[in-house]
Curated annotation (Swiss-Prot):
Family named by the database record: Belongs to the HAM1 NTPase family.
UniProt keyword list: Cytoplasm, Hydrolase, Magnesium, Manganese, Metal-binding, Nucleotide metabolism, Nucleotide-binding, Nucleus
Lineage of producing organism: Eukaryota, Fungi, Dikarya, Ascomycota, Pezizomycotina
GO biological process: deoxyribonucleoside triphosphate catabolic process; nucleotide metabolic process
Self-association and partners: Homodimer.
Name used for this protein in its record: Inosine triphosphate pyrophosphatase
Amino-acid positions noted as binding ITP in the UniProt annotation, renumbered to this chain: 10-15, 50, 66-67, 83, 142-145, 163, 168-169
Species for this entry: Fusarium vanettenii (strain ATCC MYA-4622 / CBS 123669 / FGSC 9596 / NRRL 45880 / 77-13-4) (Fusarium solani subsp. pisi)
Length: 184
């Protein structure tokens, strides 16, 4: 039996699978798909706002996530707005953003917010993974994974178990797991 339970607020089946693969069985993860307004701001501000609102709606413990893809040459853009960039310009467009630059380095950043319930403090857990932007390689079934390369392989080319050991998401969730252990 899991010592802790959280409602992961997501409509993204791939994210849910990754989170469950990393957290369970120590932390039981259930899922609710709630369309939460995303404020404009830093990744931390966006995550905190979504987490507060989700806790109010669920009236219980929630976990929310926001991801950024930060290009060094563009001063951190597209950042927290990567979802909208990808939807609008696709993988080729994400590459084209760096056409005028020799620096293709980027950082994948994942921020999870946990809130025990309405009115409770939001606690943030952030993970980062360095890499670079490359022409799309691998299956096109999870966001920008085909264009983000870490140590010679794009996230899309990696075995899921391997990706879950090194990704920005796994690094953030490791911090969440450590925090939950401290609370026991």
């Amino acid at each position: 039996m899991a010592a802790h339970k959280v409602n992961f607020i997501t409509g993204n089946a791939n994210k849910l699978r990754e989170v469950k693969a990393i957290l369970e069985p120590e932390i039981e993860v259930t899922s609710k798909s709630i369309d939460l307004e995303e404020v404009q701001g830093t990744l931390e501000e966006v995550t905190e706002s979504k987490c507060r609102r989700a806790a109010e709606l669920v009236k219980g413990p929630v976990l929310v996530e926001d991801t950024a893809l930060c290009y060094t040459a563009l001063g951190g853009l597209p950042g927290a707005y990567i979802k909208w960039f990808l939807t609008t310009i696709g993988h080729q467009g994400l590459n084209n953003l760096l056409a005028a630059y020799t620096d293709k380095s980027a950082e994948a950043v994942c921020t999870f917010g946990y809130c025990a319930g309405p009115g409770e403090k939001v606690i943030l857990f952030q993970g980062r993974c360095p890499g670079k932007i490359v022409p799309a390689r691998g299956p096109n079934n999870f966001g920008w994974d085909p264009v983000f390369e870490y140590e010679g392989q794009t996230f899309a080319e990696m075995d899921k178990v391997e990706k879950n050991k090194i990704s920005h998401r796994s690094r953030a969730l490791a911090k969440l797991q450590a925090w939950f252990k401290e609370q026991q």
